[in-house]
Amino acid sequence: MRNYRGSKVVIIGLGITGLSCVNFFLDRGVIPKVIDTRIYPPGIKKIPHVVQCYLGAFNDIWLLSATLIVVSPGVRLDHPVLIEALKLGIEIIGDIELFTREATAPIIAITGSNGKSTVTQLVSRMARIAGWHVGVAGNIGVPVLSLLNKSYQLYILEISSFQLDTTYSLRAIAAAILNVSEDHMDHYPGGLKQYWFSKQRIYKNAKICVMNALDFLTIPIYHEYDYCISFGENEDSADYYLKYYKGHTWIVAYNEYVLNCSEMRINNRINYINALSALALSDIIKIPRSVSLKVLCQFSGLAHRCQLIYKNHGVSWINDSKATNVSATKEAINNLKLCGTLHLILGGDGKLADFSSLKHLIKQHEIHLYCFGKDGLLLTTLGFSDVILTNTMIQAMRIINRRIKAKDIVLLSPACSSLDQFKSFEMRGLIFTCFAREFR
């Protein structure tokens, strides 16, 4: 544990993470200063009067006179004043780093471009049913610092690349990278390579690394670790894998057939792969296999992830609002069983992503494309023969409702962030769900 008394602490960002950092330091007798570039950040009403706040821009004087700067996830570390602060020897960290300096229980750390929330929830349910007192937090809306001082036996953390960028002391008993694909390119000027390096940081000093055998970007390459376990579809390259046997797909662990996938509530490739990684992590901490398999069979999925939310007159409406990057959208489409036309809704803030890999879907499926939001116009250039540009998602849905016929599928899988028009991907998904259920 660190003693921060006497430190000149400046916190950047006053969302849920920033507020948790403020409380962390106040509990330790340190009064931090807070900066937020927004004029009215969401946590401003919860800040005690003793804490000075500077809103609307960075305060260079505060930052360059600090001894410790704590940044919220998503704050650009290449901002000139932060670069200058580093040159002056000022430490810049995030909430995960603060947490790891204090935590005394073992940590399972999970990251990836897609699927990390699902795997985090699976492993946490397995541990709880097995009798562990588990703290779950990170990039899932629960600030990790809120878990301190609660006598947990195990921490399971979902960690984003943004959080990993400012984490140095993580020593997980098991660290997993589920997959790596292009995302947040607006945040990483070095492109996919820089984003990949950020993800790799989770392996540093991990006891066991868990990697995706089908994704070479998840292979631990430059950090020390004790042991590596792999998961994937191919038995030739993975410790945990899928195998087709006697008419069924099975989950196999070290050549042992452990679960017929037909017993799982969600029967698709995405869920099977998530199950492999979750089982690998649960085995590492010796959760009884019977408990883990029970959870895998009962799991019905998380909201806004390829979720069938309405079916009427033979038309299925699917909410995949969590698909905030291209790879997630491709996975969603490839897992559909199409008998009619696919009405695909794309749009939002693409974060400087390359959408060109969606083009091959044109040849494989009958797709009508509806584009909206900040990058809607760009998405219309993908080469789809049937494409409509609208200002909003709701406008697109109303047009779709006039065109659909039996056996069609309406899929919201935007391949983009929601923040250009919505508070969150959850809000985008809820609005999609509400309007879909109004159509008759």
Curated annotation (Swiss-Prot):
Pathway: Cell wall biogenesis; peptidoglycan biosynthesis. GO terms for cellular component: cytoplasm. It comes from the Bacteria. The keyword Protein biosynthesis does not apply. Keywords: ATP-binding, Cell cycle, Cell division, Cell shape, Cell wall biogenesis/degradation, Cytoplasm, Ligase, Nucleotide-binding, Peptidoglycan synthesis. ATP binds at G112, S113, N114, G115, K116, S117, T118. HAMAP family: MurD. It is found in: Cytoplasm. SUPFAM superfamilies: MurCD N-terminal domain, MurD-like peptide ligases, catalytic domain, MurD-like peptide ligases, peptide-binding domain. Belongs to the MurCDEF family. Signal peptide: none annotated. This is UDP-N-acetylmuramoylalanine--D-glutamate ligase. One of its GO terms (molecular function) is ATP binding. Its EC number is 6.3.2.9. It catalyses: UDP-N-acetyl-alpha-D-muramoyl-L-alanine + D-glutamate + ATP = UDP-N-acetyl-alpha-D-muramoyl-L-alanyl-D-glutamate + ADP + phosphate + H(+). GO terms for biological process: cell division; cell wall organization; peptidoglycan biosynthetic process; regulation of cell shape. The gene is murD. InterPro entries: Mur-like_cat_sf (IPR036565), Mur_ligase_C (IPR004101), Mur_ligase_C_dom_sf (IPR036615), Mur_ligase_cen (IPR013221), MurD (IPR005762). Its main location: cytoplasm. Cell wall formation. Catalyzes the addition of glutamate to the nucleotide precursor UDP-N-acetylmuramoyl-L-alanine (UMA).
